Regions:
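Predominant activation on well-ordered alpha-helical scaffold segments within soluble catalytic domains
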Residues: 21, 53, 124-131, 160, ...
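Redox- and metal-dependent alpha/beta enzyme cores, enriched for Fe-S-associated oxidoreductases
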Residues: 348-365
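Active-site metal-coordination/substrate-binding segment of hydrolases
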Residues: 58, 80-148, 154, 165-166
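Active-site-adjacent substrate-binding region
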Residues: 227-243, 375-394
Length: 394
């Protein structure tokens, strides 16, 4: 049977890659701010889901569009199925690509494009595994269901309507982790805080989504562009990381960092932190605006949450991480969003209490905190053992 499967997969490799290219070419960043009827996460995500379901229907599968929140592809009995759950939304593409992020290019055994790994390849893989089972008429004692989500990168709002409308699968596999089997997942702590911006800071903006180290941040200070540039240069904040230009309200300063997923913030460089650091050390603001900048600098520093009292580490999932991914100005206030991934050894409620206390001590008002519990399955669990055995045999 394994030889038949290998032969089928080899015969369909190019077709599979072409489907992956089609999926990757869709800019499916989850955008609830662009919601429309049937497209709660924006038009590009709606198009992404339609492409997947259309392809699945061409293979002869039963498909369902969950009103734009999710999609399902079913083989056999859906009420007694093993599920694959994958997501078709992506983190914003950021900069520094060697190829266009939504014009996928194959070089040898690699496909370059946003989402080619996380997680559209999982959608394609699961779809072709189901197609292989169907076309080879492989015997199964259960159904198989592919569940496609569209909001994994922004809080999993897609799974709320799914869980309300659909019967849970007998067991569900998540092809979005490391080889061979992930048996643990960190808990989460997501937070929004705010602080008054003061009169000398006309605006402060940074980042695109909560779960990415922000590659760019900008602000407007009420001095001339010449004064701002001179102060920054004297303090060692130089181009190309910092740019200064004139603005109607004063000087616009842009900081350029390096994007990285919130799961590994140590690989990035926060432009929000860079900008706050420059404003503080160059002496470009004072009074309430200086207090705001100092609070932002405190909040956005580091990668592991030590300053917020939430540092924790375990041998299975490693260190708790913290990313301040977004800064926005709303009226007279600056709002900051934090995405924390909590070690499985951490107590989420306790971490949230510590986090809130540290934020208030820094002069920040806490708007909200939300937590999810970690997941941990013993390595001796039969499901883990079965998956490891299958993966190593294949």
């Amino acid at each position: 049977m394994l030889e038949k499967c290998r032969a089928w997969l080899d015969a369909h490799e190019n077709e599979m890659i072409e489907d992956l290219k089609s999926f990757v070419s869709c800019c499916s960043v989850s955008r609830a701010d662009l919601a429309a009827p049937g497209a709660p996460f924006g038009p590009e995500n709606a198009e992404m889901l339609n492409r997947i379901l259309w392809r699945a229907a061409r293979f002869g599968f039963e498909t369902k569009n969950g009103n734009g929140y999710y999609g399902t592809v079913t083989l056999g009995k859906g009420d007694d199925a093993i599920g694959f759950i994958a997501h078709a939304d992506v983190v914003p593409e950021g900069n520094h690509w060697i190829h266009e992020p939504y014009n996928p290019v194959r070089e040898g055994d690699f496909l370059f494009g946003r989402g080619s790994s996380d997680n559209k390849s999982a959608c394609v893989s699961a779809l072709y595994i189901m197609r292989m089972i169907k076309e080879l008429n492989l015997p199964l004692r259960h159904g198989v269901k592919l569940i496609v989500g569209l909001s994994e990168e922004t809080g999993m709002q897609d799974m709320v309507p799914y869980n309300l409308a659909e019967k849970p699968c007998r067991v569900t596999l998540v092809p979005d982790g490391r080889f061979p089997v992930c048996y643990a997942q960190k808990g989460t702590l997501r937070a929004r805080v705010k602080i008054a911006r003061g009169e000398e800071l006309a605006g402060f903006e940074g980042g695109e989504v909560d779960n990415m180290v922000p590659p760019q941040a900008e602000c407007v200070v009420r001095v001339s562009a010449e004064e701002a540039k001179a102060a920054l240069t004297a303090s060692g904040f130089l181009a190309p990381e910092y740019e200064v230009s004139s603005d109607d309200a004063g000087a616009k300063i842009v900081a350029h960092g390096v994007a990285s997923h919130a799961a590994a913030p140590e690989h990035g460089k926060s432009a929000i932190l860079m900008l706050a650091d420059a404003l503080e050390k160059a002496g470009l603001v004072g009074g309430a605006s200086l207090r705001a900048v100092q609070a932002i600098h405190f909040f956005a520093q580091g990668c592991y949450g030590e300053h917020m009292g939430i540092a924790c580490e375990d041998p299975d999932t490693g260190k708790t991480t913290m990313t301040v991914g977004v800064a926005r100005t709303y009226g007279d206030e600056i709002e900051l969003h934090a995405d924390c991934r909590l070690s499985v050894a951490a107590n989420p409620a306790q971490m949230a209490a510590r986090f809130e206390e540290a934020a208030r001590n820094a002069g920040l008002d806490v708007i909200e905190t939300k937590t999810t519990d970690p997941v941990f399955i013993e390595k001796t669990d039969p499901r883990v053992q079965a998956l490891q055995k299958a993966y190593f045999e294949m």
